Amino acid sequence: MAILNILEFPDPRLRTLAKPVTEFDDALRQLIDDMFETMYEAPGIGLAATQVNVHKQVVVMDLSEDRSEPRVFINPSVEELTHDMGQYQEGCLSVPGFYENVDRPLRVRVKAQDRDGKPFELECEGLLAVCVQHEFDHLNGKLFVDYLSQLKRDRIKKKLEKQHRQQA
């Protein structure tokens, strides 16, 4: 297994649309394992393949404290089950150190495939619903900062660019 490099906002590669997975092979399983290792090391609770510059529809997630609930979503789609919105404070491994409130539907249904290509459905609410929507957005080139005002987005971008210059 390997720790993968996580792209950071405003890297334009984060805006790339992910392509559907068509081959469920050892290379895909290795990517999934590497993504989990990268996510746990960061540390985070979700990671989309787009964030590690692999533009395939793959998401890994684990909301547990002890890494006991790893979830894999391949070729996912999400459907709102309610128009009721909730506000959660979101952060992102691609936007390190920044947390902002984002409004999202409180309940969703996910259709996806597991690491072996087997289809499944899952109804989600609360933090799981938020995380699913956040990570699936990545597959469509969207970041949580896109839900913020232009002013907040620009401020975050400038701070991250300054950090990158200082690290260089």
Swiss-Prot record:
SUPFAM superfamilies listed in its UniProt record: Peptide deformylase
Keywords: Hydrolase, Iron, Metal-binding, Protein biosynthesis
E.C. no: 3.5.1.88
Gene3D superfamilies xrefs: Peptide deformylase
Cofactor note: Binds 1 Fe(2+) ion.
Positions contributing to Fe cation binding: 92, 134, 138
CDD domains: Pep_deformylase (cd00487)
Active site per the UniProt annotation: 135
Disulphide-bridged cysteine pairs: none
Cofactor(s) required for function per UniProt: Fe(2+)
Catalytic reactions on record: N-terminal N-formyl-L-methionyl-[peptide] + H2O = N-terminal L-methionyl-[peptide] + formate
Example GO BP: co-translational protein modification
Top-rank taxon: Bacteria
GO molecular function, one term: metal ion binding
Enzyme class: hydrolase
Function: Removes the formyl group from the N-terminal Met of newly synthesized proteins. Requires at least a dipeptide for an efficient rate of reaction. N-terminal L-methionine is a prerequisite for activity but the enzyme has broad specificity at other positions.
HAMAP family named among the record's database cross-references: Pep_deformylase
Record-stated family: Belongs to the polypeptide deformylase family.
Protein's UniProt name: Peptide deformylase 1
Organism: Pseudomonas putida (strain ATCC 47054 / DSM 6125 / CFBP 8728 / NCIMB 11950 / KT2440)
Gene that this sequence comes from: def1
